Amino acid sequence: MEGNLLVIDKRVLPEVFEKVINAKRLLKEGKVKEITEATKQAGISRSVYYKYKDYIFEFAETLQGRKVIFNMVVTHEKGVLSSVLNILSDVGGNILTIDQGLPIHGLAHVSFTIDISTMKCDIKEMLNEIELVHGVEKVEFVAME
């Protein structure tokens, strides 16, 4: 099987996954302010929440407004970031934010937030293509909304 993502009917999954989604929703909607409160209301432990929070997402009926956050470590060389930006443009990603730290020991940390609602490929393909860029040392998926 290729890829890490599956679409699964929640009726066949353990109830804990839906409870994690519920806790995330409580936090997102501002109904609770702290993770402890969200997990208590959802009926799960904090450790369960932290274990699954970055891996469980609600399926959106529409692709509008979908965002992905990923981090990279790049070498301090001319053209590396430009090559990554070209890939993001080519696949139809809309860059919402870029945050780049100062290079230390020849490496810089870069964080991207991308609107993926108009992308022509899946996230894994995009990240794999970015990893192939000369000067990109590491690519890490952080979150998806």
Swiss-Prot record:
User: Where does the record place the ACT domain?
Assistant: 69-144
**PROSITE patterns linked to this entry:** ACT
Q: Superkingdom, according to UniProt?
A: Bacteria
Which NCBIfam families does the UniProt record give? PRK04435.1
Family stated for the protein in its record: Belongs to the UPF0735 family.
| Name used for this protein in its record | UPF0735 ACT domain-containing protein CPR_1404
Lineage of the source organism?
Answer: Bacteria, Bacillati, Bacillota, Clostridia, Eubacteriales
